Amino acid sequence: MTKTSAKNSSSSTVQSPRVAIAIMAAGKGTRLKSRHPKVLHEVGGKPILAHVIATAAKVVPPKDIFVIIGHEAERVRAAVGASGVQFVVQAEQRGTGHALMVARNALAPYDQVMVLSGDAPMITAQTIQKLSAFHSAQKAAMTLLSADFNDPSGYGRVIRKSAKSAEVRAIVEEKATSRQQKNIREINSGFYVFSIPALYGHIGELTTDNAHREYYITDMAAVLVRAKQKVVVMKTPHAAEVLGSNRRSEIVDLDARLRLAKCQQLMDEGVTIFYPQTCVIDSDVEIGTDTVIEPFVQLRGKTKIGADCRIRSYCVINNTEIGDGVVVLPGCVMDDSHIANDAIVGPYSRLRPGSEIGEGAHLGNFVETKKTKLGKGSKANHLTYLGDTEIGEGVNVGAGTITCNYDGVHKHKTVIEDGVFVGSDATLVAPVRIGRGSYIAAASCITEDVPADSLALGRARQMVKEGWAREKRRQK
């Protein structure tokens, strides 16, 4: 390339604007009647605000996301701080317009800021990106996102300059609408894009001439229109994206919508979910292809399930990793555990944190494990408690076996080596080690280590008194 052509190429390049995202998360949420910040109420298995941040991070890097916090600021910061976003503290909550005043120093280096509601978790990255692109194409000072609601009551109405115009004349709040304006179904969603020079060149013109004596971001539309600045609107066809969470009923509705959307996503990826409306599957759950989820299953947290599994009804699985080809029978409860390929668990098994079930192993009905490793091909099929236990491969643990791991002060470990056969109703008092290939007789209480290939018995010798019962009956 010649110097001349290089120069022409450079001069024709349009530099992309520096874009920030500001997330409004300072409010209390009075209508929820809650002791907790509104944005920390959970939908889809995580705080509302966490959903909004995750979406924003698909559009700009976390360093360019500014979460404006106020009410219970430190709790909100602690809940979502690991996401790497920036925080701006609105110490005195004097409205949404005031929040942007407080964020002025943080946002000043940017060309454009997208303002998101911290209580609207269904907004998508695609819609945010379209809104930003529309704002740039229109060369607007302010762009707002709207939607058509069948029942727009309670929302501000968007008043356009004309029916076919993208330009906005005003945003009229519900209480100020005329009878004719109340029939307008196009509502202001609370999502905006601002040109930074226009925003901070005119934000000082906001007033508190309202019932709550606050600065409202919606008033920026009228301020900019008066200043002959261009204010436009983009309507999303997906009205559910802008739903907020001001009431408990709205939180419940959002949770249901997010979970059904998650089920649909998984089914599109090759998972079968029967009666998805009965299942609770959190946003971060991953499931492999050809796995079947039966009705009334809860999959929580960061649970990850492999391919070709079957999760039967009424299981509650939290932060657990499950391999391929695993069958989980009805009624199992699992927390922070790991199940290897081709294992069978349940029915009614309880896996507490730190449980590891090996490849092809069986954990049966009414078996509880905690900080326990069950080796490849081993079985504990009935009525058993295994705590702080390491079990090798090919072990059979008989019905009613208990590891006594707690002495009232400390926990102790039980080790059962490969190929051991533990008879029913055995009591293993930790710390204890059962050597490779040994047998433990049924009903034994084992308090000492057992060498490899041994038989251990720890019970009283059976005594039979013939005729004793007949004599006892004669005494009546």
Where are these regions (language model features)?
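Catalytic metal- and UDP-sugar-binding loop of GT-A-like glycosyltransferases, i.e.
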Residues: 43, 116, 456
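Acidic, glycine-rich loop-and-beta core segments that form the ion-binding/anion-interacting portion
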Residues: 281, 286-355, 359
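Conserved N-terminal catalytic core of the sugar/cofactor nucleotidyltransferase
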Residues: 2-20, 46-133, 137
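Conserved alpha/beta core of the MobA/IspD/sugar-nucleotide pyrophosphorylase nucleotidyltransferase superfamily
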Residues: 17, 185-288
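Glycine-rich N-terminal loop/short-helix segment of MobA-like nucleotidyltransferase
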Residues: 19-43, 59-60, 80
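Glycine-rich hexapeptide-repeat left-handed beta-helix
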Residues: 6, 11, 327-476
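Structural beta-sheet core signal
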Residues: 21-23, 67, 114-115, 142-145, ...
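Conserved core of the sugar-phosphate nucleotidyltransferase
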Residues: 74, 83, 123-211, 218, ...
